[in-house]
């Protein structure tokens, strides 16, 4: 019973003394110890085994027990010492706390004494400085009074002097005095309630009014609205009067400027009246020459009279431009039928040159907000009549690289005078647009005539497959028209020009490209099987001649160039035209037209090679395959197909070297056309023996290898065929091989044969199965049981998908092919 109680006590003690791992780790860090008894994972059994490893060591058990007892007594002594030391800790803590509280109370008392002394010191300082503050206020008020009296004296004296000098027209002294009086008067705004101050202010306003009227009268006398200008240079009186006008109401200054400019341009209105011969567009140079002479005359006679900041030379030029625009608009409306395109362009050229002259000489600081709003913000200066660093040769080279008006340097600063006169020509730009319509029509006709005269590009030359030169000529002309028209207007005329561009892009596509594509002939339709099998290497089987193949490739390359450049043309037109009109620029229809030409060209190349291979496939289907006794080399029809591929494909590849993506498209289309046709003719080879099937399998493998190598066939540089093309060939020709493997398999037992068919052909349907049975030469009675077994072994297809798998793996329908072509063309457009 006692032993059980001791065990329970030990267990409870161990439970109480069980420490968490974190606490145990902290203890080990603070009190490191190597004693096994201090370890957290202490094991009494292991510890005893360590002390007594053998039975012989038990002889020393008394010594070990004595050592442990001695250690226990030592630990007990240490514990008692520590416990006794903790008995007085609470009392010592309370005593320390009381001492700290007393120290804090003493500190608060000292702080309160310091605060009281500071308040007493502040009160003493206020009493000492009270009298000094009153003296400061008195001094400040006295200073203000003296300053105000001085200002009042200055104002009164200044007003008297101002009135006297005004009567004597002493404008030089008035300019400085008036500014001083105005500055002094500002100090009295808060004293306007005082009658005397208000009276002085009214006298200043009256003097200003009198000065303004007097100065205007002096200018009217010097420069009368009617009559000739006063001879001689400007007087010092008027020069000083302008300085005074700078200080007066701005309306006085504007009135002086208006009257002077009106008088200065009065001669111009007389010389270039609507009924005068020099007023018409053919003599527009004389207008600009006249104003240039007037500007020189002004600088010599009146340059020093007006302050420089008035910019009188620029103001005269701007007013001249407004008057000229109005006069030209009026005369062109009256004589609209007499405007010819050469005359219009001549006038616009001279006008834009004059606007450029103004931009070089003046900053445009006098152009009012209304003027700036009225004149649309100009595009970058690309005036074709001004000096242009880009030569025509450079332009043509850039166009050959597919670049249209690519920016090569930072954008030039806008010309603030752009359109200030030339805007008047915009309503008459229909003459220019009609002229460009006529010129482009003649250009297209010339292209057609040149093509007929020079003929298609010659094979075996650098011309073969190259872009037609007429294409670059067309876009060079387009660029010149676009740049020129953007100088004339960036509004509706640009939209009209875009419509003209669209019209002749379509005509070029129809007349030059589509119109010159060779027509499919039927000359090879009379080839017989015997003649096909007897043909020698190098004989002509292709429907198109070498020249015609080169022509098709050249038209394809040209259409691709037109497609890319038309897209760039659309972007540049959107940059040139007003932002509000950009949505009306859309050349997608024209790009689709060129895409159609590309598709037609590729289709012709595919049809040509396809037609060349047709007789060989017909010969394959007519051969007596049931009589073949041994497997030899590839059959003659395979040799014929390979011969035609080796004849046509290298020519097409070399001529489409600059458009590899379309050569790849040609290869893909040919594979999609040839492989289904080959499988169709394969089903016609019936009946067929086992050896015949083996020969056909060998032929099929040979064709598969040739088709896989088709993109680089006959080329010195071997390139890996595109993955998309390889996938089509492998999928299609593997199906043909699987068909032949099924044909070669014995048809008994029936279950094994049917299962083998389902395993080899993924499109396992009854129609294909029956064709294979026909190839094996089985009778209809045998076929019916096998077909029934096939229907039983086939898994039920999902609703609505029956037959669809067959269609998807047989030749694609025209709709599917057309859809695929459209998707590919859209992808090409995006990448371009």
Swiss-Prot record:
Main location: Golgi
Annotated positions of the Phosphoserine modification: 377, 580
The species this protein was found in: Mus musculus
Membrane topology recorded in Swiss-Prot or TrEMBL: Peripheral membrane protein
Compartments in which it is found: Golgi apparatus, trans-Golgi network membrane; Endosome membrane; Recycling endosome
Origin superkingdom: Eukaryota
InterPro entries cross-referenced by the UniProt entry: Vps53, Vps53_C, Vps53_C_sf, Vps53_N
Region Disordered, annotated ranges: 373-392, 794-816
Pfam families: VPS53_C, Vps53_N
Gene: Vps53
Modified residues (N6-acetyllysine): 110, 360
Record protein name field: Vacuolar protein sorting-associated protein 53 homolog
Quaternary state and interactors: Component of the Golgi-associated retrograde protein (GARP) complex, also called VFT (VPS fifty-three) complex, composed of VPS51, VPS52, VPS53 and VPS54. Component of the endosome-associated retrograde protein (EARP) complex, composed of VPS51, VPS52, VPS53 and VPS50/Syndetin. EIPR1 interacts with both EARP and GARP complexes and mediates the recruitment of the GARP complex to the trans-Golgi network. Interacts with VPS50 in an EIPR1-independent manner.
Keywords of the record: Acetylation, Coiled coil, Endosome, Golgi apparatus, Membrane, Phosphoprotein, Protein transport, Transport
Family of this protein: Belongs to the VPS53 family.
UniProt modified residues of type Phosphothreonine: 391
GO cellular component, one term: cytosol
Signal sequence interval, chain numbering: none
Biological role: Acts as a component of the GARP complex that is involved in retrograde transport from early and late endosomes to the trans-Golgi network (TGN). The GARP complex is required for the maintenance of the cycling of mannose 6-phosphate receptors between the TGN and endosomes, this cycling is necessary for proper lysosomal sorting of acid hydrolases such as CTSD. Acts as a component of the EARP complex that is involved in endocytic recycling. The EARP complex associates with Rab4-positive endosomes and promotes recycling of internalized transferrin receptor (TFRC) to the plasma membrane.
Coiled coil location: 55-142
GO biological process, one term: endocytic recycling
